[in-house]
């Protein structure tokens, strides 16, 4: 299957699951393919046939954008260079959860979250330590007796009851002994932080020299500016403790600029984020819901409220 066909399938699946899905980010380079929202759940989705193509730079940008846009970065893919991705298993690449389309279908359409995740050494599951301790005590088994049944140490059983995750083989033996409901699903929409050590959000990249004049104005009027490298916009600006967010792009007002402005409008609608595109000269005030602002107008803005007023008449204001 081609990547384009796979993106279409995943996008259709998200729509069937009740998500509002943005236009595809048909620009290069691009850190994500679509943004999607269902209620309070927002995802930034990258779709790949071979997930080995997902590099560290893209992973870092998706994680940054997830933080700034209050979204979960996810990758859906079919395989690695060596093998297909197993259904029902969450993998990780550069801190981003990865799974195959069948797992995505179960999660988003059927409401069945995955139970298994891949980590160095094999496949693992979340063990509900409190339930395990209760079941062991109900069966009047000591830590040592259960350890003998499982072929592990007494200390390891104690760690399972304290919340340590177990290999899938141990989990299957536990369920043979005590029945089901010992395992807890992987919380994919929270970035699967329950099953992995969470690294801090990667640092922002340096702004490209040609972006500095526009981004410095946003910083001057009170926005915390986060430059991007691979997104269809140049930066995400935050003001008011992150409640006032702004996707920002700039270039000459060409057909390519209109295309980017449309994508920014669509992503902004899904993520409840305002979008502005800065140009030298323009014969219009908006492209869809992306405000078009001339550089001279932007230079005359005094503060974030002044900028908000300027944008209010140009496209619909997306509320965070």
Curated annotation (Swiss-Prot):
Pfam families: HTH_3
CDD domains the UniProt entry points to: HTH_XRE
Xref: Gene3D superfamilies: lambda repressor-like DNA-binding domains
Domain HTH cro/C1-type, residue spans: 132-189
Residue range(s) of DNA binding per entry: 143-162
InterPro entries, sorted: Arc_TR_HTH, Cro/C1-type_HTH, Lambda_DNA-bd_dom_sf
GO molecular function: DNA binding; DNA-binding transcription factor activity
Entry superkingdom: Archaea
Key words, A-Z: DNA-binding, Transcription, Transcription regulation
Protein name stated in the entry: Putative HTH-type transcriptional regulatory protein VNG_2112C
């Amino acid at each position: 299957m081609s990547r384009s066909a796979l993106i279409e399938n995943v996008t259709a699946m998200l729509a069937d699951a009740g998500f509002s899905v943005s236009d595809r980010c048909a620009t290069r380079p691009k850190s994500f393919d679509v943004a999607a929202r269902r209620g309070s759940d927002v995802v930034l989705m990258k779709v790949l046939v071979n997930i080995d193509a997902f590099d560290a730079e893209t992973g870092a940008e998706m994680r940054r954008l997830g933080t700034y846009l209050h979204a979960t970065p996810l990758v859906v893919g079919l395989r690695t260079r060596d093998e297909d991705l197993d259904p029902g298993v969450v993998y990780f690449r550069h801190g981003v959860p990865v799974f195959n389309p069948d797992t995505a279908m179960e999660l988003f359409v059927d409401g069945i979250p995955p139970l298994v995740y891949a980590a160095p050494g094999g496949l693992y599951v979340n063990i509900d330590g409190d339930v395990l301790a209760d079941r062991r005590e109900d069966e009047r088994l000591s830590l040592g007796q259960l350890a003998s049944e499982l072929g592990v140490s007494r200390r390891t059983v104690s760690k399972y009851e304290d919340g340590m995750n177990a290999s899938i083989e141990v989990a299957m033996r536990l369920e043979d002994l005590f029945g089901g409901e010992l395992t807890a699903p992987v919380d994919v929409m929270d970035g699967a932080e329950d099953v992995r050590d969470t690294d801090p959000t990667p640092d922002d990249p340096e702004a490209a020299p040609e972006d500095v004049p526009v981004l410095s104005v946003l910083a001057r009027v009170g926005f915390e500016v986060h430059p991007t490298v691979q997104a269809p916009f140049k930066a995400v600006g935050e003001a008011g403790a992150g409640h006032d967010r702004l996707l920002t792009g700039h270039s000459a007002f060409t057909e390519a600029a209109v295309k980017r402005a449309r994508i920014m409008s669509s992503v902004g609608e899904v993520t409840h984020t305002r979008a502005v595109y800065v140009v030298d000269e323009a014969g219009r005030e908006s492209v869809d819901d992306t405000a078009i602002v001339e550089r001279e107008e932007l230079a005359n803005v005094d503060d974030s409220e002044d900028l908000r007023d300027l944008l209010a008449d140009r496209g619909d204001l997306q509320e965070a």
